[in-house]
Swiss-Prot record:
Taxonomic source organism: Bacillus anthracis
Record family assignment: Belongs to the phospholipase D family. Cardiolipin synthase subfamily.
Reactions it catalyzes: 2 a 1,2-diacyl-sn-glycero-3-phospho-(1'-sn-glycerol) = a cardiolipin + glycerol
Name listed for the protein in its UniProt record: Cardiolipin synthase 1
Gene Ontology BP annotations: cardiolipin biosynthetic process
């Protein structure tokens, strides 16, 4: 049933003009169109039903089609169809992909753990790898970067030190002060002979203009847009965005986390004078996986413009194998996206939270969990585990904010603690379990990150960075207001109805 909605809409358009062409009078146009729309909606409902979506998603789409039949059809044609596969990825040379994997597999011994970890951590690394994550890497150092000032300072310093290549990928990249500063640093290195590849998402970075990018092209920087929104494939790609943020310098230094590139991430916007976020600097063996993820995205996005293959990257210049001999703990990089049925990141988060014995602390700007995640958190809280959720007191999305609050009641009743960050916008995406294991990355605790976006997280095992994450959590709790059950249950009926409605349509967000 290829492209069913486009076909149905095409049939509708063609048949709708038949009465005009034939000048028939035995049936009114109003009746004719009404019947045809009914058939179209029934057809779409059938498609939704046989796609075996989650009950919440299925119900949400049925509701939209029932209440907004015309608009609902258009919305579903753009946002609702089942997970789109990267068809161009599948057409790529399987021999090249196999060779690329073999190179990484051949270095598995180099990636094998030599640092002693607890039995639980070792078991988790094995489970996460089965979910699709890369092998856990020791001899890797990580550094927690708190907020924009520290993050951009470290990134610019790393760019300045580049000798061979710089790979940079962002969901949102803005042509403001910090965006221009990073761009100019890239141009300078490109003129010095460093290879620079710049990948940005077509929707998230839709404000980038030719006049901003042209100096980069003139300096020799390779620029690729991930799934442009103005293309023949708009309906195929608009709902599946690349939300990853990656910077790699010489295959030795990497950055990933919650921060995009823009002045607002430095707290320079009137709406959010404080932007609370977290990023991660990585050096060592874990760069193997981070580099591989960037290159896969790069080759996919550039396949329509160039004749790239894996071959130019099969060398030590891109995978130098830098080791940090005195590094503690281990790092595991996990990526997921709509090109695969595996919910690697979601399953990884469930596995990490499921291993908790004492505490589960979560920071997320959007809390719209699926049923499995919500159930795990409820049961953990009931069993006495210290479950805490830190979310923004002031959100950048009213819809997401109301939907998030609809999930608070079952958690508060189970004994979980909810904290509303009051100093600004909480944009960090972090999980901390038992002060021993943590995750940090681009994925929010919501269905979009679990199923629709291309995301990336880093799982940190028993390293000093985990303690730094705990320190930041404790500081954030001091700048937050705890939501008490007695006060929360006194919300007005109007607000509860709004929350419930937003929760009902949350699978569509």
């Amino acid at each position: 049933m290829k492209k069913p909605i486009i076909q149905l809409l095409l049939i509708f358009t063609i048949v709708s003009i038949v009465p005009f062409l034939l000048n028939t009078s035995y049936i009114s146009l109003y009746t004719f169109v009404g019947v045809l729309w009914s058939i179209t909606i029934v057809g779409i409902s059938f498609v939704i039903f046989i796609e075996n979506r989650s009950p919440q998603s299925t119900l949400a789409w049925f509701l939209v089609l029932a209440l907004l039949p015309v608009v609902g059809v258009l919305l579903y044609s753009i946002f609702g169809r089942s997970r789109w596969r990267r068809k161009k990825h599948l057409h790529r040379s399987e021999e090249q992909r196999k060779l690329f994997r073999e190179i990484l597999e051949g270095r598995r011994l180099e990636l094998s753990l030599k640092v002693p970890l607890s039995e639980r951590s070792v078991h988790l690394t094995e489970v996460v790898q089965k979910f699709g994550g890369g092998p856990a890497a020791d001899r890797t150092t990580t550094k927690l970067l708190t907020n924009g000032d520290q993050t951009f300072s470290e990134i610019l310093q790393a760019i300045e030190q580049a000798k061979h290549h710089i790979h940079i990928q962002y969901y949102i990249y803005k042509s403001d002060e910090i965006g221009t500063k990073v761009r100019d640093a890239l141009i300078k290195k490109a003129k010095d002979g460093v290879i620079v590849r710049f990948l940005y998402d077509g929707l998230g970075s839709n404000t980038l203009r030719r006049r901003f990018l042209q100096p980069m092209k003139e300096a020799g920087i390779e620029i690729v847009e991930f799934d442009p929104i103005f293309s023949a494939w708009l309906l195929e790609t608009v709902n599946y965005r690349n939300h990853r943020k990656i910077v790699i310098v010489d295959g030795e230094i990497g950055f990933t986390g919650g921060l995009n590139v823009g002045d607002e991430y430095l707290g320079r916007s009137k709406k959010f004078p404080v932007w609370r976020d977290s990023h991660l600097k990585v050096e060592g063996k874990a760069l193997y996986k981070l580099q591989a993820i960037f290159l896969e995205d790069w080759l996919y996005a550039s396949s329509g413009l160039n004749t790239y293959s894996w071959d130019p990257f099969m060398n030590r210049q891109y995978f130098p194998g830098k080791e940090i001999s005195n590094a503690e703990g281990a790092v595991q990089i996990v990526a997921s996206g709509p090109s695969s049925d595996d919910k690697s990141i979601r399953n990884t988060l469930l596995a990490v939270m499921g291993s908790a014995k004492k505490s589960i602390w979560i920071a997320t700007p959007y809390f719209i969990p699926d049923q499995e995640t919500l159930t795990l958190l409820r049961l953990s809280a009931i069993s006495g585990i210290d479950v805490r959720i830190l979310y923004p007191g002031k959100s950048d999305s009213i819809i997401s904010d109301q939907a998030s609050q609809s999930y608070f009641t079952p958690l508060l009743k189970a004994g979980a603690s909810i904290y509303s960050y009051k100093d600004g916008f909480m944009h960090a995406k972090i999980l901390l379990v038992d002060d021993k294991i943590a995750t940090i990355g681009t994925a929010n605790m919501d269905v979009r990150s679990f199923e629709l976006n291309y995301e990336i997280i880093s799982v940190l095992y028993e390293s000093e960075t985990v303690h730094d994450i705990k320190r930041d959590f404790e500081d954030d709790f001091k700048h937050s207001t705890e939501i008490k059950w007695n006060a929360f249950q006194k919300r007005s009926i109007k607000k509860r109805i709004l929350e419930s409605f937003m929760r009902l349509i949350s699978p569509l967000l």
